[in-house]
Amino acid sequence: SAAISLKEKAPERSVLVLERGLFPSGASTRNAGFACFGSLTEILSDLKKTGPDKTLAVVEKRLKGLEKLRQRLGDTAMDYQPVGGYELIFDKELPALAELEKANELLQHLHPEGTYTNRPGLVKTLGFNPEKVKSVVFNPHEGHVHTGKMMQALLKLAQEKGIEVRTGAEVTAIDNSAGQVTVQVKEPVRGTVGFQAQKVAVCTNAFSETLLPGCQIVPGRGQVILTTPIPGLPWQGAFHFDEGYYYFRNVGNRVLFGGGRNLAFEAETTTVLQDNQQIQQELQRLLREVIIPGQTFGIEQQWSGIMGFTDDKQPIVKKLTDRMVLGFACNGMGVALATTIGEEVALLLADKT
């Protein structure tokens, strides 16, 4: 996204993207594909932690990013489905319903017709366990995308704009001296290869700490499972619960379900891509007991992805030097925020001062 935005602002620039893996391998191709900007309980939690100004600012960036992404790629290319967003309300979240209008008022200038509505009747309609789920909050402004198609469309657009993309190019060091920046890349034959540039953007999100110690972007691993097909799956849409720590959606008639990082914060603060059996088992339990009770299903796939977080949930975009820019920390909202952050990174790179 940053490279595309830079090329749009400065088409005369030669732009190279160095990608560590054969495919983008942190969260880009491993995210759950949610085109969302914040559930009710997540917004209320952010209001308490960071206040209305910061909460509103990041929601606006998420919405702006989703709008720009859809304009840039088109809904068909990334299989965007405007199916709406839903939040499951359990006993402990019932007090949040009393603050629903508070959240709507905060977002009123973004959605004058309203953002969140309490729909308790959906618990039965959508087949959730009524002993566990007490209500459902509906948000008509969200949806989901096909992550693989989205990344293919971004890569195709980048190549059409003349951007060179090198995969399997793991950056091991960045030397900012002698009037230019040298980026060292691991190479299996020669050991390392150096690329020289006038300016460099570090957009490695959760992996930024490796190249830039002290950058204040903390990794957070997300666990995901995908079920076998479920005949007659009674719902479609993008669903969340527990302040956004759990999320699920339909993929056709399968259920993609992820989250649970809050069960093991310390263990999941890592860049190691592997399964956490404690969380994977909890995801399966919640599927059986809450989300699709009474349904027979198997687990077809399971994986993890690495996200980047900051203490105040605000993205980081800043100049490190005249020739280096740091961007990202999507805080679990990469689909929504990446385009906006990329635009801000490009503005700093294109700055001739």
Whereabouts are the PLM-identified features?
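Flavin (FAD/FMN) cofactor-binding and adjacent substrate-gating region
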Residues: 41-47, 71-156, 161
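Helical element adjacent to the flavin cofactor pocket in flavoenzyme catalytic cores
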Residues: 130-198
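Central helical "cap/lid" subdomain
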Residues: 185-235
